[in-house]
Every structure is written in structure tokens, then in C-alpha cells.
Regions:
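C-terminal alpha-helical cap of glycosyltransferases
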Residues: 394-414
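A short, well-ordered alpha-helix in the C-terminal region of glycosyltransferases
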Residues: 369, 376-390, 397, 403
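Aromatic "clamp/platform" in nucleotide-sugar-dependent glycosyltransferases that forms part
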Residues: 318
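Nucleotide-activated donor-binding/catalytic signature segment of Leloir-type glycosyltransferases, i.e.
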Residues: 263, 267-305
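Short alpha-helical segment that forms part of, or immediately flanks, the ligand-binding pocket
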Residues: 304, 327-331, 345-346, 352
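Short hydrophobic beta-strand element within catalytic cores of glycosyltransferases
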Residues: 326, 335-338, 348, 356
Length: 414
């Protein structure tokens, strides 16, 4: 069963002071031409990841601009989401023995949802979990878009060979960057649209510094000492073990340093519990290492507080679609040390926002520099905030999606 996610309209007016005038004008013009257009955003979960956060804000803005926008999530049991998590990892390059039984399970759930989709002008399908639904709907009149948020540049051949025919039945595909496109994908149209953050969401809105610090202190963290922070799902690709190893190297040079790993348990990610249990052992052994989840009261507002209190944010990703936590930290004026992978270099360059790294040793070296040179760290972070303001705030993403929808519908009616 498809689940409709309740979304409150978000007036565009409060975003206008952040926009260059031409961007605001283009959004207004596109929205006027799309008034009443029925747009469905379809993904696997309503909480726990960057896609869900994006859709909550994006759909709200589209509604306020007059589009008949909806957000729905697919249902499925634990067996289905175990299959889709394996598929997700395989598309990012992990070797995967994708069995016939798993393929059948995946297709059965997708087929069951197809009958519920009717009456839309545009359907935007996010990531691999619902990617086969298009196959079972018949041609219809709707325009279908597959929106891929992960790095599929070197997928496992078996998994991608299975999924590719279903992806290619869509009218267009959207990737974060051109480098993510699998080499053998053939589509009528491809677009490249990076994600963005909502500066007025509970995770990113401005907060008084004393409120942020007191909130973090309530979780037992010493806010008078340096704090390293990684905000990421508990996923091997986010390398929480590498983050801990980095922290341990930094602690040799800066004994007062602490590390907080903050992540959420998403409904479509059963593997997260395995990763969480593996790192929770280290948490118990080190009083300066903290592991928090949404299940112990660390929601979006608390993440905001942690990011504003952190001295340095770490994003020790091995593979990354975009890494929204990088832009979130830079928006708050906090320097970032992050893996040079996926969409992270779009947001961050050495000396502009922070530093890109490929090893634990490099990460530790850069963090020690930032801890020992707070004035330089503040200047580096300020430069990163300017990049985010120009390129990675929600109105730019809204404009890009409205452009795509307008162009696709114009072509369909030609």
C-alpha cells in the first residue's frame, strides 16, 4: 500500500531575501505555468535520510506555488527492505549475489503498488526501491522520472543488469552529477541536479548559541571542550569506524577532544542496526565518544544544535551521493573535513569550507590544524557558507525541478 505523507505548504516569501532576483522571478514564472499540475514524489521512507528531508520541504514549496504536489512512500516488509538495501549497496559498487528469489521479492512489491498510481501528470521516483513500478503501470499519460541520489558510476554488474531495463522505461533520469551515470544507461533524457538544504527547516534554521550549547550539554557532552561531529546514517559507506579511528589519532595531539556520531534509523535500512551495534561497543569503552540516534531524542532540532556547537564536522564517507550534512555544517559556519568522494567536492574544496581527505591520517592532520588555528578555521568556514548560499539552498533545487517538469510536459504535449 502507498502511504501518503502529510505535508504543510511552505510559503516562498520567507526565502525571497536569500534569492538573487532572477532566480525568484524564474521560480514565479515556472510555477505560474505549472499551476494545478499533479506531481507525485515517490520514495521508500518518510524519515531518516536526506531524501525524506528534501521531499518534506520541496513538496511544501511546490504546493504553496499552486502545484498539486503529493509525497507518497511505498510499503514493504523487512524482507523487501533487506533486498532493496542490498540493491542500494550493489549499485554503489559492493559485489552482490542477487538471487532469483530476491528479484522476485523486489518485483512483487513494485507490482503491487503499480495499481495505486493513477491521475498524475508527473511521477518522480526516487532511488532503486520503487524503480520497477513504472514497468507495471502501462504507458498511461503520465511522465515518469527516475531520480537517483546515489553514486552508480561503477555498479555491481549483476544488480545493475537486473535494474537497468526498469530504469530505462522512464522518460527521464536525474543524477546529482554526470560522473554518477552508469556507462551503459540509455535514456531519452538525462539531467544533473544536485540536492540542497532548506535554511528554514528545524535542522537548519537559526538558533541562539546558548540554546544550542545547553541542548548538547543535556546529552552529557562537555561543551567547553573541542567537539568533533559526524552526522550520517549508520551505513558502512559513511565509514563511522573510520571516523572513530580519525578521532583517536586526533586525541593523541589534542587530548581534550570529543567525538559525537549522530545518525538516524531509517525505515528502509535494516543494515543500520548492525552498524550501530558495532560502533556502540566503542562508545561504551571511551567516555569522550558519544553515539546518538533519533531513538534517544536526537531529532532534527537537536542535530541543528550539535552542528552549531561542533568545533569541526567530519564526513568520513567512502562513497557518497551528495552528503547534505556537509552543506548543513557550512551553512552554520562550521568547518568540515570530508572524504573526497561523490558530491562532496561540489560543496567543499581545500581551504574553502574545509578540507577533502582520502585517509584517516589525512583527516586527523586536517582536524588538528583546524583545532589549533581557530581564526583560520572561521575564515575557511565562512568561505564555505558563501558557496552554500549561492549553490545549495532549496530555492535553487526548486527552480531546477520546475524547469525539468515544465520542459518534460512541454515536450509531451508537442
Amino acid at each position: 500500500m502507498l502511504n501518503r505523507v502529510p505535508v504543510q505548504p511552505k510559503p516562498i516569501d520567507r526565502y525571497l531575501p536569500l534569492l538573487e532576483e532572477p532566480l525568484g522571478q524564474e521560480i514565479s514564472r515556472l510555477a505560474a505555468s505549472l499551476r494545478g499540475t499533479r506531481v507525485l514524489q515517490l520514495n521508500a521512507t518518510s524519515y531518516g535520510g536526506g531524501v525524506a528531508e528534501l521531499l518534506l520541504s520541496l513538496v511544501g514549496l511546490e504546493q504553496s506555488l499552486g502545484l498539486a504536489a503529493e509525497w507518497r512512500t511505498i510499503g514493504g516488509d523487512e524482507a523487501f527492505f533487506s533486498v532493496t538495501k542490498q540493491l542500494h549497496n550493489a549499485l554503489q559498487g559492493r559485489p552482490s549475489p542477487f538471487t532469483e528469489e530476491q528479484k522476485t521479492r523486489y518485483l512483487t512489491v513494485n507490482r503491487q503498488h503499480a495499481a495505486e498510481l493513477d491521475g498524475y501528470d508527473v511521477v518522480i521516483v526516487h532511488d532503486p526501491q520503487p524503480a520497477a513500478i513504472r514497468h507495471y503501470t502501462g504507458r498511461g499519460h503520465a511522465t515518469w522520472v527516475w531520480r537517483c541520489h546515489i553514486d552508480t558510476s561503477a555498479p555491481d554488474e549483476t544488480a545493475w543488469g537486473f535494474l537497468r531495463p526498469y530504469v530505462e522505461e522512464h522518460d527521464a533520469a536525474v543524477f546529482t552529477m554526470a560522473q554518477f551515470v552508469p556507462p551503459d544507461l540509455t535514456m531519452p533524457r538525462m539531467e544533473f541536479i544536485p540536492p540542497a538544504i532548506d535554511p528554514f527547516s528545524s535542522k537548519n534554521r537559526e538558533l541562539p548559541g546558548d540554546l544550542a550549547r545547553s541542548t548538547v550539554a543535556e546529552f552529557g557532552v562537555d561543551v567547553e571542550r573541542p567537539l568533533l561531529l559526524q552526522v550520517a546514517r549508520f551505513d558502512p559507506w559513511k565509514d563511522p569506524k573510520g571516523a572513530i579511528d580519525t578521532y583517536q589519532l586526533v586525541k593523541r595531539e589534542v587530548p581534550a577532544v570529543q567525538l559525537a556520531l549522530v545518525g538516524s534509523m531509517a525505515g528502509d535500512d535494516p543494515e543500520a542496526w548492525e552498524v550501530f551495534r558495532a560502533i556502540a561497543h566503542d562508545d561504551r569503552a571511551d567516555r569522550d565518544l558519544y553515539v546518538f540516534t533519533n531513538l534517544v531524542g536526537v531529532g532534527s532540532l537537536e542535530v541543528n544544535c550539535f552542528q552549531r556547537t561542533a568545533t569541526v564536522v567530519l564526513q568520513k564517507s567512502l562513497r557518497e551521493g551528495f552528503g547534505l550534512a556537509v552543506s548543513e555544517a557550512l551553512w552554520k559556519g562550521v568547518p568540515v573535513v570530508a572524504g573526497a568522494t561523490g558530491g562532496i567536492p561540489l560543496q567543499l574544496q581545500d581551504g574553502v569550507g574545509g578540507f577533502l581527505i582520502t585517509t584517516v591520517e589525512q583527516a586527523a592532520q586536517r582536524i588538528v590544524f583546524l583545532l589549533r588555528h581557530p581564526q583560520e578555521a572561521a575564515q575557511i568556514a565562512a568561505a564555505g557558507r558563501r558557496v552554500v548560499t549561492e549553490h545549495f539552498l532549496l530555492p535553487r533545487l526548486l527552480r531546477d525541478e520546475l524547469r525539468l517538469i515544465h520542459s518534460l510536459l512541454e515536450g509531451a504535449h508537442a
